[in-house]
Structures are given as structure tokens and as C-alpha cells.
């Protein structure tokens, strides 16, 4: 019996230790569990689905908390569901990108990814299948990278289900995540998604990026950046072509309200798309979106509006938008652009250089600037075409002025336009507005050709007349009459600024005399001449009080110092000297002074 007792005691202790260890794994007093404690390997080969889901479910049973994911590559062969009140958290504390576009150990393979990486493989060829990760009420996905290792860089790429989606719950969050190459990234629209929160999300969605719909309480989206980094190292990538043909970065349906801040998409067919809600009742109709510092670049359609909420609509402010703005005839809501830069597209697919507007809603541009950045558009006649509805363009700038059809006729109002207000705008070129509208129209207060003909009321002056026999050399005459050495600036006269004698004046900063302006009048006959120099007024009170003027004549060299500050634009007498015939004499201005100096004109009067 004694011999049997010891083994039994040993086995009992082992069983107790195992039970205690299992209890330690299953319970956390700190609110944290780690997937490796549940058997996750993170080697990129072992299926870690069960370990992840066990950790998530155990955390939910304890009332919620954080399941951490150590650095590694975790193969998830099916999908995950993050329960209520649980956060799945990786190592990242900010959105990441690929460390290198290609892993040096596998140049033809995928990117080099570090941190907490989840490898998604389920659902190839089934875009309507189960999402890779479901979020429940008050659940969060944070600090992870998700990569599809079996995705192909083809046109089309392999279709997969959504990467992250809500189960139909409020308060779902995505923070500090990188979705490398999802076919469809985030679905907060197929099911209810009120008060969702997305911050610091990076990725290259191939077909659809972020879809929002069925949100009856304010959603918030911050710092989302979609760009083609996965294909950046592959010249002429077929995937990049697919994105420009089919890709939609942001799809916004029914939301009441939605705040969108610091978001960006580049190289998609549609950058930001507003659509009618997919459901009926309170979920019907368009959305109400406020977008700040949010835009799209290199897109066929940077903004596509199919429908917005009738009484609220959408508003862009302080945003840059590269690509066409298209408002369909299905839209009845407001679309506002305030303080935005609008640049058009290079693709010529939409029949306009910058915007095509229809529908029954009001589209307004206030304090914006329009600049068709691609000069080679050959097949478009207008910058902005308004087919129907309402348009307002106020206090804005049209930059284009070169000889192109869309520059010569920047705005077209077609007959079905109900109301148009185009006032107080500046056009660098022609301000031709073709008004065929049958509705009420106000076009007033616009100014045109401010770059091609900047001073239409100012006529270039004739050369001033002086005393009979006077010899005048102006700073605009050029050699051999005048030569400038060192650094000299030029201020030209305008219709409201006459600072110089004829066309303007040269000036130089105070210095050591290395800036020299040498005026050499052509004297027809030897004799005595009174020398004058012209000085303009002092607009900045920084002119010299001792500006030196050297007069070299047949009598030798003499220097006269002039106080420029009280002068109002006048000839200053420098003395009478004997000059030989020809260009043997000179009057020289230098910057060896206590302030800025002028060199404008010199006059010799005989007698």
C-alpha cells in the first residue's frame, strides 16, 4: 500500500497543477488575455482560429476585456467573431504600412510585414460569404495587420468577403489597423452600425473600401488612408488598372449624422460615393455627412453623388479633390464645397473637365478654387456643366487661362437648371458663362482676365517729356546706356502704383557698394550740363538717408549723397559739370548706404 500511495499522491499533484493552470488561462484579474496562452502559434502555418476564438469567448464570459496578440503571423483559416465588450488588440499603436514592399527573402512574394499579422484565406471567389471578422456591440479591433496571402495581382483579383463587418450592432470600433490587400475592407452598412468609430485605418482595398449605411446615430471616421502600396513596386500592375476601372474607396449611404475627418483615397474609379440607403423606413434615403480635410486624388470620379439627405445633405470643407465631381439626376439633397481646391481628372470619361451636375438638389461652391490640372484634355468643352437642379458659385477663383475649350467656356447652364447664382468670382482667363437656363439666374460681380490682362484700365505710359535738349537715360533702356552690376530688384509701375520715373524703378538692399547701376548718357556736344537723378517715394520707410551718387565728368569724379526718405517722386539736382562728347561720362548709383537705394533715371540739361 505504501508503494502505491506515492504514485497516487504524485498523480494528484499533477492533476491539481493542470487544473490550476487551466483556471489561470481561463480567468484574468487584469482584464487581459493573450492568444498564445490558448495555443496560438503565430508561425504562419498552424491554424490559429480555434485559439483566437477561445480567448475571445473566455474574455466575454468574464464580462469583457482585452485579448492581446503578440507579434507573429497567425493563420486564420475560417473567421472570427469578437464578442460584446471585447477588444482584440495587436502590437500597433498607430496605423502601419508594409516595412518593405517585398520581403527580401521572397522578392516575388508578398510584402514584409511585422507586428501582429492575421493571415486571411477563407472565402476565395465568394464576395458575399462570411466576413473575416465580425464585430459585436462595444467590440473593438485594434493594432493588427490583416493580409490575404493567396490574393493575386491580376485583373480582376480574387474576390473575397468583407474583411471586417458589424453583426448589426452599435458602438463597433476599428483603431490603428492596416488592411493590406482586402478585396472588400470594412462593411458598416449591410447591417445596423450606429455610433461606429474608425480611427487610423490604412490599407489598399482592391474593390470596395469603407461602406457605411443604416446608421441612425452619429458615426465618426478619422484618419483613413487608402492607397496602392501593395502594388507600388509593380509597374503597370493589373490590380491598379482594376481599381481605376471598378474600385470604390468610400461608399456612404444612410447615416444621421456622420463626421469624416482627415480621410484620403488615391487611384480609384470613385473616391467618395454617396448612395441611397439599402433599407426602407428610417433607413431609407441618403445620408448627412460632414467631411473636413477629406478628399481623393487621381480618381476618375473623386466625388460621385447619387443621393444625399434632402434637408441636410453633405458638406466638404478645407479639402483637396483631384478628379471629377459628378452629381446624378437622382439626387435631391444639398452638396456643399467650402474652401476647397478642385482639380478635375485626366481621364476625360465624364464629358467635363471638372464637374457635371444634375438632379433637384442644390450644389454650392464657396471660396473655392477651380484648376484643371491636366492641360491636355482635348475632348471636353466645359469645366462645369450644370444639366439641372440648382447651382451656386460664389467668391471663388477659376485659375485656368490657357487656350483650351474648357477654359474658353468654363461654365454651361443647360435649360433644366432651376436656379443659379454665380457671383463675385475671379477668372484668370475668360469668364464666359453660357446661360441657357430657363430658371432664375443671377450672374454678377465677376471679374475676368486678371492674369491675361491684369490691368485693363492702365495704359503703358508714354515716355515723359523734359526740357528741350535734355538727355535722359532710364533704367529700362538697357546697355550701353545703363548697366547693372550685383543684385538689383525691379518695381514696375501699375495703374495704382507709380513709384518710378517711366515704367518703374530699380532698387537694391543696403550693402557694401557691390551693387552698382552705371548710367552713361550719350552727350552730343561737349559742354556744361546740369545733372539730375530721379527718385521715387519711400513706401516702406526703409530708404537710405545717404544714398551715394558718383558723377564722373571731364572734371573728374565727385560723389553726392542724397537723403531719399522725404522724396515724393522727383528730380534731384546733383550739380553742374563739364562733359565731353560721347559716352565718356557716367552717373553711378551704389548700395553703400544706410538703407535701400534706388537707380531710376538720369537727366543732363545743357547750360
Question: At which residue positions do the language-model features occur?
Answer:
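Positively charged n-region of N-terminal signal peptides that target proteins for export
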Residues: 1-4
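Bacterial Sec-dependent signal peptides at the C-terminal "C-region" and cleavage site
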Residues: 16-26
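Acidic Gly/Asp/Thr-rich repetitive segments characteristic of extracellular carbohydrate-active
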Residues: 35-70
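Extracellular beta-strand-rich solenoid/capping regions of secreted or surface-exposed proteins
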Residues: 53-61, 74-89, 93-142, 147-171, ...
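Extracytoplasmic
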Residues: 456-607
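Short glycine/acidic-rich loop motifs that flank beta-strands on beta-rich extracellular proteins
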Residues: 64-65, 77-79, 97-100, 124, ...
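Feature marks extracellular polysaccharide-active and adherence modules
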Residues: 70, 77, 83, 89-91, ...
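Bacterial N-terminal signal peptides
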Residues: 7-17
Amino acid at each position: 500500500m505504501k508503494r502505491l500511495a506515492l504514485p497516487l499522491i504524485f498523480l494528484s499533484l499533477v492533476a491539481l497543477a493542470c487544473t490550476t493552470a487551466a483556471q489561470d488561462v481561463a480567468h484574468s484579474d487584469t482584464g487581459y488575455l493573450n492568444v498564445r496562452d490558448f495555443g496560438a502559434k503565430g508561425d504562419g502555418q498552424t491554424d490559429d482560429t480555434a485559439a483566437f476564438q477561445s480567448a475571445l469567448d473566455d474574455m466575454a464570459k468574464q464580462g469583457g476585456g482585452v485579448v492581446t496578440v503578440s507579434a507573429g503571423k497567425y493563420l486564420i483559416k475560417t473567421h472570427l467573431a469578437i464578442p460584446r465588450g471585447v477588444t482584440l488588440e495587436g502590437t500597433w499603436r498607430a496605423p502601419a504600412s508594409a516595412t518593405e514592399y517585398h520581403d527580401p527573402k521572397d522578392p516575388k512574394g508578398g510584402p514584409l510585414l511585422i507586428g501582429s499579422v492575421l493571415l486571411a484565406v477563407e472565402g476565395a471567389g465568394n464576395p458575399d460569404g462570411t466576413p473575416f471578422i465580425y464585430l459585436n456591440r462595444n467590440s473593438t479591433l485594434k493594432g493588427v495587420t490583416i493580409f490575404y496571402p493567396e490574393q493575386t495581382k491580376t485583373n480582376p483579383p480574387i474576390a473575397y468577403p468583407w474583411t471586417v463587418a458589424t453583426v448589426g450592432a452599435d458602438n463597433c470600433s476599428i483603431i490603428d489597423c492596416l488592411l493590406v490587400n482586402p478585396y472588400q475592407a470594412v462593411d458598416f452598412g449591410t447591417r445596423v452600425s450606429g455610433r461606429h468609430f474608425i480611427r487610423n485605418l490604412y490599407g489598399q482595398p482592391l474593390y470596395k473600401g469603407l461602406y457605411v449605411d443604416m446608421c441612425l446615430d452619429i458615426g465618426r471616421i478619422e484618419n483613413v488612408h487608402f492607397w496602392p502600396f501593395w502594388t507600388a513596386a509593380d509597374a503597370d500592375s493589373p490590380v491598379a488598372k482594376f481599381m481605376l476601372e471598378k474600385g470604390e474607396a468610400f461608399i456612404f449611404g444612410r447615416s444621421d449624422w456622420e463626421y469624416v475627418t482627415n480621410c484620403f483615397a488615391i487611384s480609384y474609379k470613385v473616391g467618395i460615393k454617396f448612395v441611397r440607403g439599402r433599407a426602407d423606413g428610417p433607413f431609407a434615403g441618403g445620408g448627412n455627412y460632414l467631411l473636413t480635410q477629406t478628399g481623393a486624388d487621381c480618381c476618375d470620379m473623386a466625388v460621385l453623388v447619387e443621393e444625399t439627405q434632402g434637408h441636410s445633405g453633405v458638406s466638404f470643407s478645407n479639402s483637396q479633390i483631384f478628379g471629377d465631381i459628378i452629381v446624378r439626376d437622382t439626387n435631391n439633397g444639398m452638396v456643399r464645397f467650402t474652401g476647397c481646391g478642385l482639380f478635375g481628372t485626366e481621364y476625360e470619361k465624364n464629358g467635363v473637365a471638372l464637374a457635371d451636375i444634375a438632379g433637384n438638389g442644390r450644389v454650392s461652391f464657396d471660396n473655392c478654387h477651380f484648376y484643371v490640372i491636366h492641360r491636355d484634355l482635348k475632348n471636353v468643352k466645359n469645366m462645369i456643366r450644370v444639366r439641372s437642379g440648382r447651382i451656386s458659385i460664389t467668391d471663388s477663383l477659376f485659375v485656368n487661362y490657357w487656350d483650351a475649350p474648357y477654359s474658353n467656356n468654363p461654365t454651361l447652364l443647360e435649360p433644366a437648371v432651376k436656379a443659379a447664382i454665380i457671383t463675385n468670382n475671379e477668372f484668370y482667363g475668360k469668364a464666359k458663362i453660357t446661360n441657357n437656363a430657363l430658371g432664375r439666374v443671377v450672374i454678377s460681380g465677376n471679374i475676368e482676365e486678371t492674369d491675361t490682362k491684369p490691368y485693363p484700365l492702365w495704359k503703358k505710359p508714354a515716355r515723359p517729356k523734359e526740357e528741350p535738349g535734355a538727355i535722359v537715360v532710364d533704367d529700362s533702356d538697357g546697355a550701353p546706356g545703363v548697366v547693372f552690376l550685383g543684385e538689383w530688384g525691379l518695381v514696375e509701375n501699375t495703374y495704382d502704383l507709380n513709384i518710378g520715373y517711366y515704367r518703374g524703378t530699380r532698387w537694391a538692399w543696403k550693402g557694401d557698394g557691390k551693387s552698382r547701376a552705371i548710367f552713361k548718357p550719350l552727350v552730343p556736344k561737349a559742354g556744361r550740363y546740369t545733372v539730375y537723378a530721379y527718385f521715387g517715394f519711400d513706401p516702406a520707410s526703409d530708404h537710405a538717408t545717404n544714398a551715394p551718387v558718383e558723377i564722373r565728368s571731364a572734371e573728374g569724379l565727385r560723389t553726392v549723397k542724397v537723403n531719399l526718405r522725404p522724396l515724393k517722386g522727383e528730380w534731384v539736382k546733383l550739380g553742374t559739370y563739364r562733359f565731353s562728347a560721347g559716352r565718356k561720362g557716367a552717373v553711378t548709383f551704389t548700395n553703400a548706404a544706410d538703407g535701400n537705394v534706388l537707380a531710376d533715371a538720369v537727366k543732363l540739361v545743357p547750360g
